[in-house]
Amino acid sequence: VLRVSTQVLEHFRDVAEVLQLPHGRVRLEGAYLGGGFGGKEDVTVECLLGLLVWKTRRPVQLVFSREESFIGHGKRHPYVLRYKTGATRSGELVAMEAEVISDSGAYAALSPWVLLYSLVTATGPYRVPNVKVDAHTVYTNNPIASAYRTFGSIQTCVAYEGQMDALARAIGMDPLLLREKNFLRKGDSIATGQVLESEPMLGETMRRAWEALGPVRAGEGPVRIARGLGASLTPYGRMCWTRDSASAWVGMELDGTAVVRCAAPDVGGGQTSSLCSITAEILGLPLEQVTAVGRDSHFTPRAGTTTATRQLFMSGNAVLKAAGEVRRHLVDQAAEMLEASPADIELLDGRAMVRGAPDRALPFSALVRAATARGRPVQVLDKYDAPSAPTIDPATGQGKPFNDYTFGTQAVEVEVDEETGQTRVTRLAACYDIGQAINRQSAEGQVEGGAIQGLGHAILEEVVLEDGVSKNPHLLDYKIPTTLDAPPVVVVLLESGQGLGPFGAKGIGEPAMTPTPAAVMNAVSRAAGAPVVQFPLTAERVLAALKHPSPPSGERAG
């Protein structure tokens, strides 16, 4: 039995292969954790821990030091991106050409998959009729690079959003108007030729985010104030070349409460609470009467990885199906006992009642006990299959790589000290269409957390390497944002009901971070009067741009 902080319970199979044991001999329990962000998607300690336990025949605890973790675990891929964008003088995009190079480090790990995501998102949320993208991932002697929140989308977002601001300056057009003219709409195709089957609502997300920043402020003394924007499309659901699936079990206890069993690892994103909320909604139960059992490879149905913003989409739909069948059993039992038509039975607050006759009602406990006594326990195991498997033609790059996408926009306000180059983000607003909020507090927290994490990437975080060796493998010199660095964040959630998740929901875990660095880059570049495109946007890099400004044109005030 292994207990590991992981995003993938299926790693028990890797341990079994290493130990040359039948898969059923290895049990993996997922530990509670506050975040994974891709760093716990790879096999990390599982096989080492399994070997130690097998050889010593004793309990073993394996804990990495901060330095060991920095050195031994995957990082976000460093990218070099070269873009050229063509447009008419009226601002309609005509063509985009991109060269994308990622540093894989010493091993491939998930680098090919990350690069594929970059290819799919290379043109962002824009309508571009002619596209050419060449992408390469290369081996180097640098630390291994692997999965990290947004999985290749954040790097391309920086490139295409920087191009949109540069193009706006070149043709003398308001950058918001330029985006509005070229945003994808229902029926348009993305770079791979996939046709969007729902309305992205990009114009509204941009306007709402921009307005949420509030009144424009003027800088004082050496401080310049500017605003920037980042819009994005980010897929939710896994690109796995086979049809993705997830399973869940929902059952009623004799006291009328419900239990959900699903192996979806909860990595701090509210996966467990969302599955409980779905069950409660379908069955007509108070949320506190639904219990979740998960994180155990032996006792919960396979649900796949907590990666790719897929768990609400996949496991959420599996729970929705299973709970729907349980509801049908409860309704049929109630109809029989209350001598009514199933169409007239309502489920509310743990009771089944005849519509229009509230005195004709029974608690769920009575229904479950009666069904169980007849050998019909009220429990269902069900499976959800994604609508389609990813398809990409390797010769043309065309196809349908994902079932759906989440669209959104972030806007930021920055202060830049023209004497020191120091940058401070003072306001941040984000607007996304999430389809349907299953747990609004959790969704808002995802967006706030993703945005602050994105600020860290934009301004602070940098792995310093010398001959392939990390020179700052600790949190003393590798800076991450704290509460003192976090600006006020305004989150606006739109609910179009157009998603493929339960009740029309869309995933938000990774999209919450995608456009943040791009928005900060555009704001800082506007304040500096010249492009600042190397991340992080350190004081030295900003100061260099301040000393060599290029006159802006066609930009919105502020």
Residue ranges and their predicted role:
Residues 7-29, 41-51, 128, 271, ...:
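Active-site-proximal gating segment of KS-fold condensing enzymes and close homologs
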Residues 20-27, 54-60, 89, 114-234, ...:
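C-terminal catalytic domains of large/alpha subunits in multi-subunit enzymes
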Residues 66-131:
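Active-site cavity-forming subdomains of large catalytic enzyme subunits
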